[in-house]
Amino acid sequence: FTLNIPGPIKVFPLGEMTFEEGIRLIDSQLHAWKIPVLEKRTIRDFTGNEQFWSVKGDTLFIKEILCLLEDSLSFDIDVIRTDETKVSRTELGFPGRKCLLCSNDAFVCSRSRTHTVKELLDKACELMKDYFEEKQAKKLSSLSMQALLYEVSATPKPGLVDRNNTGAHKDMDIFTFEASAVSLNHYFEKFALCGMEKEHENGHEPFSRIFARLRSLGIQAEDAMMTATKGINTHKGLIFSLAILNCSLGYMYANHIPYSPDTLLSINRKLVADVLEDFKDITAETARTNGERLYALYGMK
């Protein structure tokens, strides 16, 4: 196993991350299918990292399960028989590898030098970056959903919904909260990806623009929640809070900003810097929510 990295530079941080992820994914497949691993060996060199497995099993079956991995990233996974012949994708009915940049056969593009090395390397790096950003977004989404489920499951909570009763609420129970949490899982991921997006090539996008995109996603999330709960507001406040939190964490990840609570809070503030503009014309009479009314009467934020 190695990576298909175009150009002379084969080893760099993002490539190293992808190489280690490839090893993890292949190990996981071999373990899941109970394929005995007799020996493993890693070779690290400036010409490119390589990982070898000596396994016991049906080579055609092993190639089949690894072909699905091969198509997900810039993985180059060869399965070699004991007679030193290589199992090809076409033996299993899989099409040849496609070019990273177009739908043509990769071998044809390579032979005719259809694309420049820079174009191919940029695309390979983009695929690797997108993979890890999506993985991080899914992790943040999972943690957000866990938080919602743990919160409603905490028992007892006098006056609030918990596992044993509905507290002061007559229109919702723990199942309402669970349905709401499930409906929001996909949006928590989108909130994180929103912070990772870069509308400008140099990456310096105003936080106000990011927040505008985030707000649109938040409205969609509220609609999904209301559909799941049949019109009951279970998590509207948490949608707002977790949208900001996940977006900020996504922004930090994509921009390689080391995590600290103070840094996270600073980015949160920058994201919502203009949100008070929404309240400048609100009065106690025109307020639509308790929060707006408290702001109009007492300036509570």
Task: Report residues per predicted region.
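A contiguous pocket-lining binding segment that forms or flanks enzyme active sites
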Residues: 51-68, 293-301
